[in-house]
Amino acid sequence: MYNPPLFREDRPEILHAILREARLAILVSAGTDGVPEATHVPLQLAADEGKHGTLYGHLARANTHWRGLAAAGRARAIFMGPEAYVSPSFYASKREHGKVVPTWNYVAVHAIGAIEVFEDAARLHALVERLTNHHEAPRAKPWAVDDAPEAFIASQLKGIVGLRLEIETLIGKRKLSQNRPEQDQHGVIEGLGSSEDARDRDVAALMQRGS
């Protein structure tokens, strides 16, 4: 990922927060035909496992990408945070000299590391329990894996494979108009903050916090 120093984010706690908030990742690995393979998959962070944390998830067994992941042994998980189109009309500089163009503000993290594909039924059961409990936790009446018949769950587990990606490298980028003069940054915050699109307002809030 192209990542100029001005936009680089290296703080582990910020990077981990982005992973948790994004939830859905694009998992990419080298393809056997020279074309990269990619799958959209929810991944859960275990921050206390490994130097930079470990990601867990699962794929449908019918998705042949898992075989490519097993063969490659390494993968990149791409997480997107808030993003927004930035109009030149937000800039004070537009009124001063007009030498402005559109851009896009966004937050992204790439997690790179060794990936393990596993099929053991006990590990898969523990994995889906952990993932389910995590995502059901905010609900007033959370669903649990044990709510379904045991034989049914066992049959469902046969249709998936587990993933474990131990993160070796975390690359973070927060492109939030840091390259613009202060008055232009204020204009972007005001412009995005008054948008009817919640995604725009999320970016404005990030810029407003300034960290």
Language-model segments: what does each one mean?
Residues 1-211:
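Binding-site signature for planar aromatic cofactors or substrates
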